[in-house]
């Protein structure tokens, strides 16, 4: 039986998960929920099912794989990654996985806070000011490695791709000073399964966020 991935009909927190499902050639189907328009942003499609799915912590996204019912986007990523040995092998690799997993989520959340804020126009210049340093840290962490953990791809490369791509959309020039990050993105998008997915009708590059967001909601 295919796994079921449940999420809003947006890119959001499901982007890295969808990419990983495709890369691993996993059998899955999507349950997409639609949020209503302003001013109410009706969530009844999701709320009507929220407590009926047997989830311990009902939330979106969720993944149901037989008796396994998982929420929290990084827990979902790790679950898929463990099936395919994509969590790092040595202690050093696992440390790098853990660091980047959390760093990518922090940075992604920082951008989301700005994009969802009613004060978006005030917050954007300050965020852009700190962006070069943020990208520099990613660049230094990657170094000359082909993937963020080393020679082999791991699930955190999917998270890193997502967060770097989000920032590239937010500020198209933000990676210009970091050729290794641009190479990483090209390398990732050039993977056979990823490239095929991005050309398919299943691919959902936008909207980046829900309709509640000030930026990235279309």
UniProtKB/Swiss-Prot annotation:
Major subcellular site: cytoplasm
Swiss-Prot/TrEMBL GO biological process terms: glutathione derivative biosynthetic process; glutathione metabolic process; hepoxilin biosynthetic process; prostaglandin metabolic process
Location of the GST N-terminal domain: 2-88
Record InterPro entries: Glutathione-S-Trfase_C-like, Glutathione-S-Trfase_C_sf, Glutathione_S-Trfase, Glutathione_S-Trfase_N, GST_C, GST_mu, GST_superfamily, Thioredoxin-like_sf
Modified residues (Phosphothreonine): 34
EC number(s) from the headed UniProt entry: 2.5.1.18
Keywords, sorted A to Z: Cytoplasm, Lipid metabolism, Phosphoprotein, Transferase
Amino acids binding glutathione: 7-8, 43-46, 50, 59-60, 72-73
Family: Belongs to the GST superfamily. Mu family.
Protein name as annotated: Glutathione S-transferase Mu 1
């Amino acid at each position: 039986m295919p796994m079921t991935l449940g999420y809003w009909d947006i890119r959001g927190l499901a982007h890295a998960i969808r990419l990983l499902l495709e890369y691993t050639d996993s059998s899955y189907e999507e349950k997409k929920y639609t949020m209503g328009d302003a001013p109410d942003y009706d969530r009844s499609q999701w709320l009507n099912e929220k407590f009926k799915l047997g989830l311990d912590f009902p939330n979106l996204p969720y993944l149901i794989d037989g008796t396994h019912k998982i929420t929290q986007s990084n827990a979902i990523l790790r679950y898929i990654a463990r099936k395919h040995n994509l969590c790092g092998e040595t202690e050093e690799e696992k440390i790098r996985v853990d660091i980047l997993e959390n760093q990518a989520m922090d940075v992604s959340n920082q951008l989301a806070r700005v994009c969802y804020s009613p004060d978006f126009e005030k917050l954007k210049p300050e965020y852009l000011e700190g962006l070069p340093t943020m990208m520099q840290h990613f660049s230094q962490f990657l170094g000359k490695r082909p993937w963020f953990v080393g020679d082999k791809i791991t699930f955190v490369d999917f998270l890193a791709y997502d967060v770097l791509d989000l920032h590239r959309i937010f500020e198209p020039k933000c990676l210009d000073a970091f050729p290794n990050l641009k190479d990483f993105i090209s390398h990732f998008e050039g993977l056979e399964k990823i490239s095929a997915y991005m050309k398919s009708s299943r691919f959902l590059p936008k909207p980046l966020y829900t309709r509640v967001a000030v930026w990235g909601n279309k």
